[in-house]
Amino acid sequence: MRLKDHVAIVTGGGGAVGGGIATCLAQEGADIVVSDINLEAAEIRANKLKEIGRRVITVRSDITVEKDCQFLIQECLKSFGKIDILVNNAGHFGKRLGLPFTNQTEEEWDDNYNINVKGPFFLCKAVSSHMMERSFGKIINISSIAAKRDPQIVPAYAAGKNALLTLTRIVAKDLAPFNINVNAICPGMIWGEFWQRLAPLVAAGDDQFDASMDPRELFEAWVNKNAPFKREQTPEDIGNLAVFLSSKEARNITGQAIHVDGGMAM
């Protein structure tokens, strides 16, 4: 097990991608703090992780609130005594999709920025002193392929995820002297709540797709058209990369944004 005796925090751990990341880390030996604003979802995931044989706790946290982020770090230290890995996975697409930037509100942009950028900033800041004292740590920020393709139908989300990549490089440079690796993962096309909402908008904006198609069918058609590998990505794909970036094999990798997108951003 590559992560035996490691302790990892995964924010947004009650969701599909966060759950996949937490599961992969646990399968490689890490004990897990599942953090989510939805405590019930976090507890469901935690129960599954306990079946693997790991020690697991749940913490409800709103990452847009700095005190919540500090509390999350404190709860992990109280339960496990250390933090080896922080995965900033919690994110937000926005309440309204498919609008050009001219039709979006200041509130929508603030909402995206608070969750997708300020939340990871708060947590990187909160965990850094502990990791610096130990001269060890792995921080992984979950961005998106939207940061590289600049999709017009999610402008605030894409801008926020791009800002997260800049934050990743800044934090990586500051923490490198303390043997702390900081990287980002850019997931591609993963079926879930986002795509269930997005599929009709994609169909409406592309004559090659039939708007009457089932959202799942439309998603598969879009993947087939846009991904060179012509296959979707999974939460486990993201989790497997998170395991590698958390391992000693990745000790010389920092400040990078790695795509898991089937070649879509080439």
Predicted regions and their residues:
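Short, small/polar-rich loop/turn modules that mediate ligand/substrate recognition or access, typified
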Residues: 176, 181, 253-255
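Substrate-binding pocket helix/loop in short-chain dehydrogenase/reductase
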Residues: 69, 97-101, 105-110, 223
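C-terminal substrate-recognition "lid" of short-chain dehydrogenase/reductases
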Residues: 2, 121, 132, 136, ...
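Residue(s) in the substrate-gating loop at a strand-loop-helix junction
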Residues: 144
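Canonical Rossmann dinucleotide-binding motif of NAD(H)/NADP(H)-dependent dehydrogenases/reductases
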Residues: 3-33
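Alpha-helical segment proximal to the catalytic Tyr-Lys
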Residues: 129, 173-174, 251
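Active-site helix of classical SDR
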Residues: 124, 160, 168
